[in-house]
């Protein structure tokens, strides 16, 4: 920072530098230290208060200097405008013998009599003067310090010589203290004179005093009084001729000769010549009188003695006239001072009245403010009590609803347990039948083996001779063997189907057990949530706590059903050529039994399928209830909270990594700078040695000036303006997006109002109608809360990829995972939180979720990511132009990452809106990339300069080695070329030193600027994240209130239907009674007319 040549400002800057902690900035502690060093009043509390509100990051030297000047100016104004200081000036030609005369106790004009003050008055006087404004007496004089200084200068100009002693005595006014001692002057000789300041100084004092700050009424009165006093004394004072002390002590020769001629003294010039005053133009009166007295003593003649006496008398007459003039002037000045003093007393009285009125108004205002604050406090207390009561009612209603939900859940649990027991009994019956069938099959197999063995033995006994082996029995045996093989294959297939059926039954049992476990867990979790909510209600009724727990959506068991199938062994019997008809009949009967068992198994399978369909229908029916909807909303909320926490953790880790990298680079840079400084100091020492050795002759070469730094500064300013404009555009787009979201929320409310009829008729729907409604709801855009939130683009998460990367230095990629729960091809763009990110070391990877066109097009470039995040959304299809633009942006990001050693993140891939929203971050990234390149170029230049400096050091070492030879050579002859070379080297060294200092300063400023921008952007990110969290909380609250309204409407509708049914029943009863009465009337009317 440039500091002026003022030594006081330089000293202040040195003190500022000694106290600073940051780079040119002061925090609160360093400000207190600097104020204590400057010895300010109250340690500069007012100065720190003026600086603390507007500068949160720190205070620079310029800001501190301006604030200090304002503080000192206010202090000086307060001191000068506090009141007039009454002083009296006594100016004498010689030192005076002053005596103090005790004045009697008198009633002062400005004295306020002490009274008993009732109440507490904080400001100014405690009572008002009893006398009137125009009944005040006149004091000596009321002068300020400036008037006294001017009077001293005028007195010095009046005296005109330094030999005379000037005495200026200041005393308080006579009316300030009762019984004060007045300063009197005792004149020992007639030549001593007491005078006051000249009239022009008094006029200036009047003009200064009347310019003081007063109220409008007092100012008008003061102006009238000053005009009257000036009109009274201007004529008498201005008519006088001012007489100086020189005129009193000296007189001209011409005036002496005229006075003597009027006194009829002959030969005046000869007389002056005799007295010794012939050649002088002005004569001292005392010396002339002394000379005349000496002449009178020495003269004997009467005539000459009379002439001398007449001359002496004429001199005394002129001196007496001068004294009269001086006395008249003093008298007029005294009158003028008394009038001024009287006017000043009147002004003081007016000011006292104004001060009392002002302080009375201040007290009234303070009382009114206190009353307003008390009223506001009472209203605030009322509002808080009302809120407390409302919150208590709300939470009591919530607890009642939760208890009803618990009762319904317990009933569902009982129903499911009964169904589970029935299924278990059926399963045990099926297992017993299956075991019986298996035993029968094994027995048949054993009988078949025995029969085969017997057939083989009979065939061997019969076919022992080849002569009795006809062809027909062989063919018949071959056919039998083929049929046997087919039967065996069928048996094996039946055994496999039996094993599969067992596996399915085992899986069904496991699923039933898992459902039971899930019910138990949900019940325990509901109880825990009730306990937590009760504790939260006790702690704070109006604040919502942040829950960090596993969402209910993750309570599903992910256990795979174990393979519970049993390995079956199939024994193949030996084939035989012969068979028996009885055995074949037994086998046919067994086949019929197995077929019947297969039919039973198929019927059981159908039964299981029907049960599964009923379970699905029951689940879908339960999902349509508002309780399940609220549960889904709670799960989505917890997922969003978890995603937000993951995002915060991710960015914190990123920031910590960036800070560590920045600190490492700064340490490396400081080490290099330290080494370069050491080398530079050594070089400077050697250059000084050479300067001492050789003389400095020759002219300096011109320094090369370059305008690169100015151009770079102008470019940086232009880029900063662009960044500001882009940030303004982005804020406008965010405001538009918020308005669109609000309109969509209103649409959702309307849809919820239309869906009341569907919810009221849900109790009368069958399983098929429930399935159809669920399918239609799956197709609709607002079928589930998660799909609706996806449509509103409120759910978003920069999920971390779970794939292990080879390079641990680069962080895991940020994913935009696809697949919303309601529909896969949702056509809406989401604004991810990573769009506002600035520094990121993760490359961008696109996720492949479903058959979306963006992912299918980029399947070759990017690998498929692992499983989707708990909350995900598919991307929209985009035009080829937009896709090309997004690919170009990704390529730019990749090139910038390879050049600067860091990769910047870019999520602007999907549509024009997201591209416009990401314009400011991309501009920031380009600017940071360019600054990084510029920093690298500066480092290269510094390295080049350090190499040049090392070369110069080597040259200087060589010159030192050649020093004795050069000394001998210079002793013989002179070498101007070496001298010029040395001068050039010195100039070059100085130029290099200046360049290095400039570059160091510029790099430091760049680093500070980038760090400040980084901090500002981090704060902006935090604020945006907080606003988004608040918006999400508001939306969830609105959705919960909408769900509660739907529930209330459903309950009311059910009550209304019940009342309608009851009324219809009553109407039917009334109609029946009416019909019966009519019939009775008809019967009663027919009896008397009978024959």
UniProtKB/Swiss-Prot annotation:
Disruption phenotype: Viable and fertile. However, one report found that hatching rate is severely decreased in mutants, likely resulting from most embryos exhibiting varying severities of mitotic defects, such as excessive nuclear fallout, abnormal nuclear aggregates, bridges between chromosomes, chromosome segregation defects, delocalization of the centrosome from the mitotic spindle, and in some cases failure of cellularization, monopolar and tripolar spindles. Moderate reduction in survival to adulthood and a small decrease in larval motility.
Segments of skewed composition (Basic and acidic residues): 527-537, 547-563, 616-634
Primary location: cytoplasm
Entry-annotated residues carrying Phosphothreonine: 144
Biased composition (Polar residues): 168-177, 822-845, 894-913
Source domain of life: Eukaryota
Protein localization: Cytoplasm, Cytoskeleton, Microtubule organizing center, Centrosome; Cytoplasm, Cytoskeleton, Microtubule organizing center; Cytoplasm, Perinuclear region; Cytoplasm
Low complexity bias locations: 846-860
Location of the region described as Disordered in the Swiss-Prot/TrEMBL record: 100-216, 456-483, 525-602, 616-639, 799-919
Gene Ontology MF terms in the entry: microtubule binding
Segment forming the signal sequence: none
Assigned GO CC terms: centrosome; pericentriolar material; perinuclear region of cytoplasm
A biological process term (GO) from this entry: microtubule organizing center attachment site organization
Region of interest called Sufficient for binding to microtubules, as start-end residue ranges on this chain: 1-361
Complexes and interactors: Interacts with ens.
Name this protein carries in UniProt: Ninein homolog
């Amino acid at each position: 920072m440039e500091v002026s040549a003022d030594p006081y400002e330089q000293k202040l800057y040195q003190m500022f530098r000694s106290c600073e902690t940051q780079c040119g900035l002061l925090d609160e502690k360093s400000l207190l230290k600097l104020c204590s060093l400057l010895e300010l009043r109250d340690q500069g509390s007012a100065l720190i208060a003026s600086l603390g509100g507007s500068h949160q990051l720190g205070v620079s030297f310029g800001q501190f200097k301006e604030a200090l000047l304002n503080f000192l100016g206010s202090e000086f104004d307060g001191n000068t405008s506090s009141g007039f200081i009454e002083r009296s000036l006594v100016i004498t030609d010689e030192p005076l013998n002053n005596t103090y005369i005790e004045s009697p106790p008198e009633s002062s004009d400005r004295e306020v009599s002490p009274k008993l003050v009732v109440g507490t008055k904080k400001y100014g006087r405690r009572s008002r003067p009893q006398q009137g404004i125009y009944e005040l007496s006149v004091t000596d004089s009321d002068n300020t310090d400036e008037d006294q200084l001017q009077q001293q200068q005028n007195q010095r100009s009046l005296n005109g010589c330094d030999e005379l002693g000037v005495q200026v005595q200041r005393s308080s006014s006579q009316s300030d203290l009762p019984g004060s001692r007045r300063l009197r002057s005792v004149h020992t000789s007639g030549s001593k004179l007491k005078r006051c300041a000249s009239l022009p100084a008094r006029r200036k004092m009047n003009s200064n005093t009347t310019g003081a700050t007063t109220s409008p009424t007092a100012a008008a009165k003061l102006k009238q009084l000053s005009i009257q006093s000036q009109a009274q004394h201007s004529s008498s004072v201005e008519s006088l001729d001012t007489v100086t002390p020189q005129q009193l002590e000296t007189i001209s020769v011409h005036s002496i000769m005229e006075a003597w001629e009027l006194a009829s003294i002959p030969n005046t010039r000869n007389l002056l010549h005799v007295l010794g005053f012939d050649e002088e133009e002005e004569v001292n009166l005392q010396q002339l009188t002394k000379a005349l007295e000496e002449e009178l003593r020495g003269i004997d003649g009467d005539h000459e003695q009379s002439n001398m006496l007449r001359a002496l008398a004429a001199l005394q007459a002129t001196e007496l006239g001068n004294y009269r003039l001086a006395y008249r002037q003093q008298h007029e000045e005294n009158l003028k001072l008394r009038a001024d003093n009287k006017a000043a007393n009147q002004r003081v009285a007016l000011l006292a009245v104004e001060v009392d009125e002002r302080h009375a108004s201040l007290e009234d205002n303070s009382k009114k403010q206190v009353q307003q604050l008390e009223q506001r406090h009472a209203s605030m207390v009322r509002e808080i009590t009302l809120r407390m009561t409302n919150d208590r009612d709300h939470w009591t209603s919530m607890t009642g609803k939760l208890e009803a939900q618990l009762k319904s859940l317990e009933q569902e649990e009982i129903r499911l347990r009964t169904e589970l027991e029935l299924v278990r009994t059926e399963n045990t019956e099926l297992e017993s039948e299956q075991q019986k069938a298996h035993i029968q099959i094994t027995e048949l197999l054993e009988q078949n083996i025995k029969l085969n063995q017997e057939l083989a033995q009979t065939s061997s006994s019969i076919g022992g001779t080849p002569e009795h082996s006809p062809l027909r029995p062989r063919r018949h045996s071959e056919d039998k063997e083929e049929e046997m093989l087919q039967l065996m294959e069928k048996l094996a297939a039946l055994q496999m189907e039996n094993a599969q059926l067992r596996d399915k039954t085992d899986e069904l049992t496991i699923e039933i057990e898992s459902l039971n476990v899930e019910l138990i867990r949900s019940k325990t979790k509901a109880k825990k949530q009730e306990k937590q909510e009760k504790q939260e209600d006790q702690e704070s009724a109006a604040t919502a706590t942040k829950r960090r727990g596993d969402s209910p959506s993750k309570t599903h068991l992910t256990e795979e059903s174990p393979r519970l199938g049993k390995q079956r062994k199939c024994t193949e019997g030996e084939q035989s050529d012969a068979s028996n008809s009885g055995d074949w009949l037994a086998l046919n009967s067994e086949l019929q039994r197995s077929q019947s068992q297969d039919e039973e198994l198929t019927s059981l399978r159908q039964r299981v399928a029907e049960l599964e369909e009923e379970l699905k229908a029951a689940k879908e029916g339960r999902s349509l209830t508002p309780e399940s909807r609220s549960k889904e909303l709670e799960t989505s909320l917890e997922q969003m909270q978890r995603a937000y926490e993951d995002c915060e953790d991710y960015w914190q880790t990123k920031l910590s990594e960036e800070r560590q990298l920045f600190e490492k680079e700064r340490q490396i840079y400081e080490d290099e700078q330290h080494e370069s400084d050491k080398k530079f100091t050594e070089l400077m020492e050697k250059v000084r040695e050479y300067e001492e050795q050789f003389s400095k002759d020759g002219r300096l070469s011109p320094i090369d000036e370059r305008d690169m730094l100015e151009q770079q500064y102008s470019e940086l300013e232009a880029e900063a303006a662009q960044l500001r404009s882009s940030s303004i555009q982005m804020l406008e787009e965010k405001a538009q997006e918020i308005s669109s979201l609000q309109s969509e929320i209103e649409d959702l409310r309307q849809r919820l109002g239309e869906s009341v009829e569907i919810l009221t008729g849900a109790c009368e729907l069958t399983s098929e109608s429930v399935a159809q409604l669920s399918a239609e709801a799956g197709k609709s855009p607002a079928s589930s809360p998660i799909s609706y939130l996806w449509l509103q683009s409120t759910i978003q998460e920069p999920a971390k990829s779970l794939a292990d990367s080879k390079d641990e230095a680069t962080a895991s990629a940020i994913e935009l995972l696809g697949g919303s729960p309601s529909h896969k091809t949702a056509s809406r763009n989401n604004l991810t939180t990573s769009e506002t990110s600035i520094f990121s070391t993760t490359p961008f990877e696109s996720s492949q979720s479903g058959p979306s066109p963006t992912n299918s097009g980029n399947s070759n470039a990017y690998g498929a990511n692992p499983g989707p995040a708990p909350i995900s959304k598919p991307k929209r299809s985009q035009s080829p132009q937009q896709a090309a633009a997004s690919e170009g942006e990704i390529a730019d990001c990749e090139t910038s990452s390879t050049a600067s050693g860091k990769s910047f993140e870019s999520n602007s891939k999907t549509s024009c809106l997201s591209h416009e929203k990401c314009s400011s971050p991309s501009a920031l990234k380009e600017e940071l990339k360019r600054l990084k390149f510029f920093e690298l170029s500066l480092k290269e230049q510094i390295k080049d300069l350090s190499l040049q400096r090392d070369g110069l050091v080597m040259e200087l070492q060589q010159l030192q080695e050649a020093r004795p030879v050069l000394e001998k050579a210079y002793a013989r002859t002179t070498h101007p070329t070496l001298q010029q070379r040395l001068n050039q080297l010195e100039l070059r060294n100085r130029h290099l030193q200046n360049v290095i200092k400039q570059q160091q300063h510029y790099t430091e400023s760049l680093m500070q600027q980038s760090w400040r921008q980084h901090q500002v952007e981090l704060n902006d990110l935090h604020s945006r994240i907080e606003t988004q969290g608040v918006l999400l909380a508001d939306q969830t609250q609105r959705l919960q209130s909408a769900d509660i309204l739907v529930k209330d409407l459903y309950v009311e509708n059910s009550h209304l239907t019940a009342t309608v049914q009851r009324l219809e029943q009553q109407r039917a009863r009334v109609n029946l009674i009416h019909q019966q009465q009519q019939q009775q009337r008809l019967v009663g009317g027919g009896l008397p007319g009978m024959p």
